[in-house]
Each structure stands twice: as C-alpha cells, then as structure tokens.
Amino acid sequence: YTTLFRSDPENFKNGDHTMTFMRTEKGKSILIEHNVMTPRPYNRKYQLTGSRGYANKYPVEEFCFAKEVIANEPEFKGVKINEHDAIPEGIQKVLMEKYMHPIWKELQDVAKKVGGHGGMDYIMDYRLVYCLRNGLPLDMDVYDLAEWCCVVELSRLSIENGCAPVEVPDFTRGAWDKIEGYSHAMAE
C-alpha cells in the first residue's frame, strides 16, 4: 500500500505510523497507534498508564504501582518494591488470579484454545451470541459502535487539517454520562 501511494500525495496522506491522541470529557487521555508497515516485533500495545499504576499485557506482561497502592495491598506486605520497577512475577500471578474477571475465569481454557488474539476474539463472539440467545442487552451498544468507528474518519479529518483537534460527535445526544459504571448482563 505504501509503495503504491507514496508517490501520489493526493491519495496517501498518512505516514507508516499513525498516532491518534484523544482527551475524554472527564480529562482522561487515550493514545491509539496504528502501524502495519514498518518492520518490528508484533505488539498489541495493550497498556494502561495512570497516576496509581501501569499495566502492560502483550507481549511483555508487567505491572507497576504507586507507593500508596503497594502500601494498601496485602500481597505486597514484607516485599521491597520500587514503584518504578515491575512487581515480582509471583505477586503478579497472585494479583491476576485475585482480580480475574468472572467471564475470563469461566472461559479462559476454551478461549485460549480456539480464539484468536489470546482468546479475546472468542470472548467477544461468545458474549455476543450469549446475549442474543438470552434476550439480553449487548455488552457493546450502537453508541459504542459509532464511537469506535468514527475514530478512523475523524483521524483522517485531523490529518487533512495539519493534525488539528477534531471534536467527536455526541452520538447519545447528551446522555453519554447517564450510565453508571459498566456491567455484563447475565441470564438468571
């Protein structure tokens, strides 16, 4: 793709590596990187970074926590941990088990066996079919779909305008903050 359009700037506005930076209404930051052109190791870049900790899932699974988190988590008692170092693998395994999501706990074996991307594709498909079969609301609704899909088009508009900020439309017409938290619908 790159070699086809690089000599035709009218049809190729992107670089090989595109970064989309978003700031939410609640002041959170999201960075999405897309690069399928340059040679480099495969990395899904599933990473969360915040003032109380850091989590990276693939290809290297590691976690770091702020001092107050380390002080309040019983698993850290008696273990000397620097907040700028990854926690020891043994403690990481204990925490992963302690905070494992119930859906993953139930489906992880079959998900890893038959599902792509470490099982996440299977989980998403499983939840869609489960909700449809049981007449439950889907985990992702039409507003999620619109928000996820608009990122590509809004990124294009930003690139065409010198990487200018672009407002994300409020597809919910003002109801974006009415849902309290997030939960999975389950059949009785």
Range-by-range predicted roles:
Residues 1-4:
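Short, small-residue-biased leader/transition segments that mark boundaries at the very start
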Residues 6-8, 24-26, 36-38, 52, ...:
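Short, flexible loop/turn elements at secondary-structure junctions
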Residues 9-12, 38-41, 56:
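Short glycine/serine/proline-enriched coil/turn segments at secondary-structure junctions
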Residues 15, 20-26, 48-50:
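Active-site beta-strand termini and strand-to-loop segments that position acidic
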Residues 17, 32-42, 116-117:
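Glycine-rich phosphate/pyrophosphate-binding beta-alpha loops
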Residues 35, 60-61:
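Residue-level structural signal for beta-strand termini and adjacent loop
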Residues 41-44, 49-51, 56-59, 70-188:
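C-terminal helical cap and adjacent loop that interface with cofactors, partners, or active-site loops
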